[in-house]
């Protein structure tokens, strides 16, 4: 009991001390700390990346060559010293994972310490598509493949719609930039359904994004990759054709595609 009273007394003293501290001690200014003033400013630009391994910069060397980091480093949204950046993406994430886990974190309220992004980039769906590829490789009955693929991509469309709806409601001032899926010729050569499957997927992305008349924008990564060489790791000698992540060059192309749409819709 005495120990509990001591702890309570310490908490009261701490609260009084913190409450009495001058504002300059609670939030250092650039002149006092030597730290760039822009990131301490109330109006600092806030950029959040959501998605899967591609948004995470997986297998980029170094990882900061991933498209998300390139957007930050090239000051696509604002100068670096006036930009707060949060990469919430996770390798392996499906559209369901983004909807259930990343979106709620993106919507944490400012009063609770939330990020309150002004710009959001989203790259998700590759792992949804890989589930179809796995099904094709393991299911002996080809007549079930198209229904399964249709089901997966249709559910992806529902998830994407819910992701964008929740972001629009929870962050009404934020602008959201959504990538579609680039072609993977090495897989398409081995799995004839892969090309039509990606085309259907991109149609769904286009339709869902089109349902939001403001602050949601399509980034046509598919078009940006067309005709390019060595943009995907599976194209490189000695690498499995089923390696679907971009090369550093591919990430650069993605960053350029995003930057063009962002610049046009600031």
PLM feature segments, named:
Residues 33-43, 99-117, 162-173:
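Short amphipathic alpha-helices and their capping/turn segments at secondary-structure boundaries
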Residues 11-19:
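Bacterial N-terminal signal peptides
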Residues 2-10:
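Bacterial N-terminal signal peptides that target proteins for export
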Residues 97-154, 183-184:
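Oxyanion-hole/transition-state-stabilizing segment in secreted/luminal serine hydrolases
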Residues 27-89:
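Serine-esterase "nucleophile elbow" of acetyl-processing enzymes
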Residues 78-79, 162-175, 204-219:
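A structural motif corresponding to the C-terminal end of an alpha-helix
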Residues 46-51, 55-56, 84-89, 118-123, ...:
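Structural recognition of the beta-strand scaffold that forms the well-ordered cores
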């Amino acid at each position: 009991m005495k120990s509990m009273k001591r702890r309570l007394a310490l908490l009261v003293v701490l609260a009084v001390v913190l409450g009495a501290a001058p504002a300059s001690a609670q939030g250092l200014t650039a002149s006092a700390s030597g730290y760039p003033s822009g990131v301490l400013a109330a109006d600092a630009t806030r950029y959040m990346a959501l998605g899967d391994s591609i948004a995470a910069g997986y297998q980029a060397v170094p990882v900061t060559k991933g498209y998300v980091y390139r957007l930050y480093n090239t000051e696509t949204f604002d100068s670096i010293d006036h930009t707060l950046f949060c990469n919430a993406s996770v390798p392996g994430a499906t559209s369901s994972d983004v909807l259930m886990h990343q979106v709620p974190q993106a919507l944490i309220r400012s009063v609770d310490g939330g990020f309150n992004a002004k710009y959001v980039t989203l790259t998700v769906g590759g792992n949804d598509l890989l589930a179809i590829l796995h099904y094709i490789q393991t299911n002996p009955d080809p007549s079930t493949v198209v229904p399964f693929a249709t089901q997966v991509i249709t559910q992806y469309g529902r998830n994407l719609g819910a992701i964008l709806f929740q972001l629009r409601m929870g962050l009404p001032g934020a602008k959201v930039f959504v990538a579609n899926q680039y072609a993977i010729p090495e897989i398409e050569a081995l799995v004839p359904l892969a090309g039509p499957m990606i085309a259907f997927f991109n149609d769904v992305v286009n339709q869902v994004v089109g349902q939001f008349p403001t602050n949601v924008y399509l980034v046509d990564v598919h078009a940006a990759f067309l005709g390019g060489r060595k943009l995907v790791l599976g194209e490189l000698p000695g690498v499995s054709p089923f390696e679907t992540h971009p090369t550093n060059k591919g990430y650069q192309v993605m960053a350029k595609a995003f930057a063009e749409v962002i610049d046009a819709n600031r």
